Amino acid sequence: MILSDKTILKMLAEKTLIIEPLEKEQIQPASVDIRLGNTFSIVEDSCTGIINLEKEVKYKTITSDTYILLPNQFVLATTMEYFELPNNLTAFVEGRSSLGRLGLFIQNAGWVDPGFKGEITLELFNANRCAIELKAGRRVGQLVFAKMDDTALNPYKGKYQGQKGATGSRVFLDYEVK
Protein backbone atom coordinates (compact mmCIF):
# COMPACT_ATOMS: atom_id res chain seq x y z
CA MET A 1 0.00 0.00 0.00
CA ILE A 2 1.40 3.40 -1.02
CA LEU A 3 1.40 5.90 1.83
CA SER A 4 -0.66 9.09 1.70
CA ASP A 5 0.57 12.49 2.84
CA LYS A 6 -1.53 12.04 5.99
CA THR A 7 0.25 8.79 6.90
CA ILE A 8 3.68 10.21 6.01
CA LEU A 9 3.05 13.21 8.29
CA LYS A 10 1.89 10.92 11.10
CA MET A 11 5.00 8.71 10.81
CA LEU A 12 7.25 11.79 10.77
CA ALA A 13 5.54 13.16 13.90
CA GLU A 14 5.92 9.78 15.64
CA LYS A 15 9.55 9.61 14.44
CA THR A 16 9.00 6.13 12.99
CA LEU A 17 10.10 7.65 9.66
CA ILE A 18 12.96 10.14 9.69
CA ILE A 19 13.72 12.62 6.90
CA GLU A 20 16.12 15.47 7.69
CA PRO A 21 16.11 18.25 6.67
CA LEU A 22 12.52 18.42 5.47
CA GLU A 23 10.31 21.36 4.48
CA LYS A 24 6.53 20.90 4.64
CA GLU A 25 6.28 21.87 0.94
CA GLN A 26 8.18 18.69 0.02
CA ILE A 27 5.31 16.49 1.17
CA GLN A 28 3.07 15.66 -1.78
CA PRO A 29 -0.23 13.70 -1.82
CA ALA A 30 1.55 10.32 -2.19
CA SER A 31 5.29 11.09 -2.03
CA VAL A 32 8.03 13.28 -0.63
CA ASP A 33 10.11 15.48 -2.93
CA ILE A 34 13.85 14.83 -2.72
CA ARG A 35 16.40 17.58 -3.28
CA LEU A 36 19.87 17.51 -4.75
CA GLY A 37 22.73 17.65 -2.26
CA ASN A 38 26.10 19.30 -2.86
CA THR A 39 28.30 16.23 -3.36
CA PHE A 40 29.08 14.85 -6.83
CA SER A 41 31.35 11.94 -7.77
CA ILE A 42 32.71 10.84 -11.14
CA VAL A 43 34.74 7.75 -11.97
CA GLU A 44 38.42 8.59 -12.33
CA ASP A 45 39.93 7.76 -15.70
CA SER A 46 41.50 4.32 -15.89
CA CYS A 47 44.72 3.71 -17.80
CA THR A 48 43.09 0.65 -19.41
CA GLY A 49 39.72 2.27 -20.06
CA ILE A 50 38.02 -0.80 -18.56
CA ILE A 51 36.18 -1.07 -15.25
CA ASN A 52 36.85 -4.39 -13.49
CA LEU A 53 33.87 -5.26 -11.26
CA GLU A 54 36.11 -7.30 -8.96
CA LYS A 55 38.21 -4.28 -7.97
CA GLU A 56 37.44 -1.03 -6.18
CA VAL A 57 36.85 1.85 -8.59
CA LYS A 58 38.34 5.23 -7.71
CA TYR A 59 36.13 8.33 -7.79
CA LYS A 60 36.81 12.03 -7.89
CA THR A 61 34.46 13.73 -5.42
CA ILE A 62 33.46 17.36 -5.79
CA THR A 63 31.66 19.38 -3.13
CA SER A 64 29.90 22.34 -4.71
CA ASP A 65 26.49 24.01 -4.74
CA THR A 66 26.60 23.96 -8.56
CA TYR A 67 27.66 21.24 -10.99
CA ILE A 68 27.62 21.50 -14.79
CA LEU A 69 26.56 18.12 -16.20
CA LEU A 70 27.93 17.89 -19.73
CA PRO A 71 26.07 16.21 -22.62
CA ASN A 72 26.24 12.40 -22.36
CA GLN A 73 27.93 12.67 -18.95
CA PHE A 74 27.18 10.46 -15.96
CA VAL A 75 27.67 11.63 -12.37
CA LEU A 76 26.79 10.33 -8.94
CA ALA A 77 25.02 12.83 -6.72
CA THR A 78 23.31 12.65 -3.35
CA THR A 79 20.10 13.77 -1.77
CA MET A 80 20.15 16.71 0.59
CA GLU A 81 17.97 14.61 2.89
CA TYR A 82 19.03 11.85 5.27
CA PHE A 83 16.51 9.00 5.67
CA GLU A 84 15.76 6.34 8.25
CA LEU A 85 13.11 3.84 7.15
CA PRO A 86 11.43 1.50 9.63
CA ASN A 87 11.62 -2.25 9.04
CA ASN A 88 8.10 -2.41 7.58
CA LEU A 89 8.47 0.34 4.98
CA THR A 90 10.13 0.43 1.57
CA ALA A 91 10.44 3.29 -0.91
CA PHE A 92 10.84 3.91 -4.63
CA VAL A 93 12.86 6.77 -6.11
CA GLU A 94 11.25 8.44 -9.12
CA GLY A 95 12.77 11.24 -11.19
CA ARG A 96 10.82 14.39 -11.92
CA SER A 97 9.09 14.38 -15.29
CA SER A 98 9.94 18.06 -15.84
CA LEU A 99 13.66 17.25 -15.63
CA GLY A 100 13.35 14.06 -17.69
CA ARG A 101 11.82 16.16 -20.48
CA LEU A 102 15.09 18.12 -20.55
CA GLY A 103 17.12 14.92 -20.88
CA LEU A 104 18.17 14.67 -17.22
CA PHE A 105 17.65 11.10 -16.09
CA ILE A 106 17.91 9.70 -12.58
CA GLN A 107 19.23 6.24 -13.38
CA ASN A 108 19.36 4.70 -9.96
CA ALA A 109 18.29 1.28 -8.83
CA GLY A 110 15.16 3.08 -7.64
CA TRP A 111 14.64 0.97 -4.55
CA VAL A 112 15.17 1.77 -0.87
CA ASP A 113 15.07 -1.27 1.41
CA PRO A 114 13.28 -1.42 4.76
CA GLY A 115 15.66 -0.47 7.56
CA PHE A 116 17.85 1.72 5.31
CA LYS A 117 19.59 4.67 6.98
CA GLY A 118 21.52 7.28 5.04
CA GLU A 119 21.45 9.71 2.15
CA ILE A 120 20.34 8.31 -1.19
CA THR A 121 22.93 8.25 -3.97
CA LEU A 122 21.45 9.39 -7.29
CA GLU A 123 22.87 8.32 -10.64
CA LEU A 124 22.35 11.24 -13.03
CA PHE A 125 22.77 11.14 -16.80
CA ASN A 126 22.46 14.04 -19.26
CA ALA A 127 20.96 12.76 -22.53
CA ASN A 128 20.65 16.31 -23.91
CA ARG A 129 22.95 17.97 -26.47
CA CYS A 130 23.36 20.88 -24.05
CA ALA A 131 24.99 20.98 -20.63
CA ILE A 132 22.63 21.13 -17.64
CA GLU A 133 23.38 23.27 -14.59
CA LEU A 134 22.57 21.37 -11.40
CA LYS A 135 22.10 23.29 -8.16
CA ALA A 136 22.05 21.93 -4.63
CA GLY A 137 18.60 22.25 -3.09
CA ARG A 138 16.69 21.75 -6.37
CA ARG A 139 13.93 19.15 -6.29
CA VAL A 140 15.04 16.31 -8.57
CA GLY A 141 12.66 13.49 -7.71
CA GLN A 142 10.16 11.94 -5.36
CA LEU A 143 10.30 9.15 -2.83
CA VAL A 144 7.15 7.00 -2.85
CA PHE A 145 6.69 4.95 0.32
CA ALA A 146 4.98 1.56 0.48
CA LYS A 147 4.02 -0.28 3.64
CA MET A 148 4.90 -3.97 3.68
CA ASP A 149 2.48 -6.69 4.77
CA ASP A 150 4.80 -7.49 7.70
CA THR A 151 8.09 -6.36 9.23
CA ALA A 152 11.15 -7.52 7.26
CA LEU A 153 12.76 -10.63 8.71
CA ASN A 154 16.16 -9.31 7.57
CA PRO A 155 16.04 -5.50 7.29
CA TYR A 156 18.75 -3.76 5.29
CA LYS A 157 22.24 -3.94 6.74
CA GLY A 158 24.09 -3.82 3.43
CA LYS A 159 27.22 -2.14 2.16
CA TYR A 160 25.53 1.25 1.68
CA GLN A 161 23.97 1.46 5.17
CA GLY A 162 24.71 4.88 6.70
CA GLN A 163 26.11 6.33 3.47
CA LYS A 164 26.60 10.08 3.24
CA GLY A 165 27.54 11.97 0.11
CA ALA A 166 27.64 10.63 -3.44
CA THR A 167 28.78 7.09 -2.65
CA GLY A 168 30.54 5.16 -5.39
CA SER A 169 29.84 1.57 -6.36
CA ARG A 170 30.84 -1.11 -3.88
CA VAL A 171 30.07 -3.94 -6.31
CA PHE A 172 33.57 -5.32 -5.67
CA LEU A 173 32.33 -6.33 -2.19
CA ASP A 174 29.54 -8.51 -3.62
CA TYR A 175 29.53 -12.24 -3.38
CA GLU A 176 27.66 -13.99 -6.15
CA VAL A 177 25.06 -16.66 -5.44
CA LYS A 178 26.17 -19.97 -6.90
From Swiss-Prot:
Keyword NAD attached: no
Q: State the Gene Ontology BP annotations.
A: dUMP biosynthetic process; dUTP biosynthetic process
Instruction: Name the residues annotated as catalytic in the UniProt entry.
Output: 123 (proton donor/acceptor)
Q: What is the lineage of its organism?
A: Bacteria, Bacillati, Bacillota, Clostridia, Eubacteriales
The Swiss-Prot or TrEMBL record describes its family as follows: Belongs to the dCTP deaminase family.
Q: In which pathway does it act?
A: Pyrimidine metabolism; dUMP biosynthesis; dUMP from dCTP: step 1/1
Pfam families registered for this protein in UniProt: DCD
Which residues are dCTP-binding?
96-101, 113, 121-123, 142, 156, 163
SUPFAM superfamilies linked to this entry = dUTPase-like
Which source organism does the UniProt entry give?
A: Acetivibrio thermocellus (strain ATCC 27405 / DSM 1237 / JCM 9322 / NBRC 103400 / NCIMB 10682 / NRRL B-4536 / VPI 7372)
Q: Where is this site: Important for bifunctional activity?
A: 110-111
User: Which PANTHER family does this UniProt record tie to the protein?
Assistant: DCTP DEAMINASE
Q: Give the catalysed reaction(s), semicolon-separated.
A: dCTP + 2 H2O = dUMP + NH4(+) + diphosphate
Its name, as the record gives it, is dCTP deaminase, dUMP-forming
Question: According to its UniProt entry, what is the function of this protein?
Answer: Bifunctional enzyme that catalyzes both the deamination of dCTP to dUTP and the hydrolysis of dUTP to dUMP without releasing the toxic dUTP intermediate.
